[in-house]
Amino acid sequence: MARKTPINRYRNIGIVAHVDAGKTTTTERVLFYTGLSHKIGEVHDGAATMDWMEQEQERGITITSAATTCFWAGMDKQYDQHRINIIDTPGHVDFTIEVERSLRVLDGAVVVFCGSSGVEPQSETVWRQADKYHVPRVVFVNKMDRAGADFERVVGQIRKRLGATCVPIHLNIGSEENFRGVIDLIKMKAINWNESDQGMTFTYEGIPAELQDRAEALRTELVEAAAEASDELMDKYLEGEELTEEEIKLALRQRTINNEIVLATCGSAFKNKGVQAVLDAVIEFLPAPADVPAITGVLDDKDETEATRPADDEAPFAALAFKIATDPFVGTLTFFRCYSGVVNTGDSVYNPVKAKRERFGRIVQMHAKDREELKEVRAGDIAAAIGLKDVTTGDTLCDPNHIITLERMDFPEPVISIAVEPRSQADQEKMALALGKLAAEDPSFKVNTDEESGQTIISGMGELHLDIIVDRMRREFSVECNVGKPQVAYRETIRGKVDVEGKFVRQSGGRGQFGHVWLTIEPNEEGAGYEFINNIVGGAIPKEFIPSVDKGIHEQMQNGVLAGYPVLDVKVTLFDGSYHDVDSSEMAFKIAGSMGFRKGAAEAKPVLLEPTMKVEVTTPEDWMGDVVGDLNRRRGVIEGMEDGVAGIKIVLAKVPLSEMFGYSTDLRSATQGRASYSMEFFNYSEAPNNVAKAIIDARQS
């Protein structure tokens, strides 16, 4: 079967934003204008197409990234038909993991900002994530009809707070209730969308006289930004020649794809103005799969050679599973991005991370929650497979004859835990099944059993994250459960360096056990995790026993040394030891490694680490003193203060998570409900002695 749309007319994009910037409404309009939904769904009514889980429709926030495919040929039908694969991502801080894994498989993004509140804390997080994966962006300043909307102020904030070179290609005509349309600064014409057909048609008009000067000034900035794309254009511009519309567009496209500039558009999705022009910008300025560097991975050979997979149907098949979702009708859906090659239904593929073969039973393309069956998937496509048995988020799927492992995604450690218990015996098994499925879907959600109390502990990225997990267990799996008080996920590490002996000997007639190791235990760099170095020379310990020592140390690290919390950032070097021809076994060396680590870590100045959160409080000036005083009482460190709009102040602080429980209620009562806050995980830092002592005593009592 030949390719329907050439790969240069593909756009894989995400729509990302802060929680209330109007992202889902923007996506709804995209579906409406591209002819995929005949009735516009409103978030206000709980009827939006992309928000397909019940919790999303109730809370009015998007939780899972629904993937959808649509076609667009331009507002004026000026292009060939382009295929746009869109992933709608959540904006709430507790779901940053969803955003992160979507950005990993996208080629470009539309970042939506609210015209009145501008750059908010979550926008910065999303922006940093997009920087991390080098995703080219176009900005859409939405809600231009809202009170206090100011397009140029938001552009200024993007430059200042996000450090981006932001170049407007639109200028708004009127704002707040007088918002009428936009000026296209490349064509230097006003666009007037027709209200009678919900903006499906439009007319070009002259620029209003009062905006002529401002539009010309902004156009000069835009042409200068385009001219910087190449020496030839710069020479032409400096010699006073006009750049053609075609030259400007190609230059802006090149600089956007290179992440040198970010183009800004504006409008109001709710009022059906502007989204149509954003779709044009996606086609004109965001990359096709072949315009971005080919994805890299490592081959399945001795040296783990680096290799690339270009966006080409002829290349061997390689794809990345970026999301697992449970569908009530078909079971598990594995969303994947095909980077190279072609795969057909019924084909066998290989998962190098799990070292297993999988078979593609059925392949579907999703439109929010409607499915279209596909026979094949080609380079550049985003689709979902049904019937894959053992695939988790971030796994590679590839051609069994050309094995490659694409780089995996990093997932943040959960910072908050709660105990859950089923209400009845009948719910016990159902709960285990439900938690297993939810953990497979979401890598930032972990489930484990507390060995002492036997309780099931679930951990996640924040209180809302865990609320929604408990809610989903009730609705999707009919499991009723009781929930305990939230607990903080503490960690431990060491500050000193020691050499230590670990010896496990059992010799009492018959076959005994003998394992003997010498280890150097020292701190590793922050964030570097656990590192095991084998420095055994001359066969002091046979090769086959060394992985067991590593395993024993690793298992002991999970149990901690101070208060039973997992140990982070440690480097262990195995440098000597001895063995017994008959009595040595893998088990004996595993126990010796574990004993050595427990003894050594206890001597290497162990300390307790607590999660610190980056907190941003937005408050009217009158309550500023109260807010700062309260954060100080919570062991917070005030990092800075900024001015918001209309007498609003923004306080930036780092505060230990343990001090932030119940903060929203306290903040509301202290400021008569007028202040709001957001927080996200920042890092693990050493807990003060008095705090550490209280936690250790509580764990040991």
From Swiss-Prot:
One of its GO terms (biological process) is ribosome disassembly. Residues 8-290 form the tr-type G domain. Its main location: cytoplasm. GTP binds at residues 17-24, 88-92, 142-145. PROSITE patterns: G_TR_1, G_TR_2. It comes from the Bacteria. SUPFAM superfamilies: EF-G C-terminal domain-like (SSF54980), P-loop containing nucleoside triphosphate hydrolases (SSF52540), Ribosomal protein S5 domain 2-like (SSF54211), Translation proteins (SSF50447). GO terms for molecular function: GTP binding; GTPase activity; guanosine tetraphosphate binding; translation elongation factor activity. Catalyzes the GTP-dependent ribosomal translocation step during translation elongation. During this step, the ribosome changes from the pre-translocational (PRE) to the post-translocational (POST) state as the newly formed A-site-bound peptidyl-tRNA and P-site-bound deacylated tRNA move to the P and E sites, respectively. Catalyzes the coordinated movement of the two tRNA molecules, the mRNA and conformational changes in the ribosome. This is Elongation factor G 2. It comes from Pseudoalteromonas atlantica (strain T6c / ATCC BAA-1087).
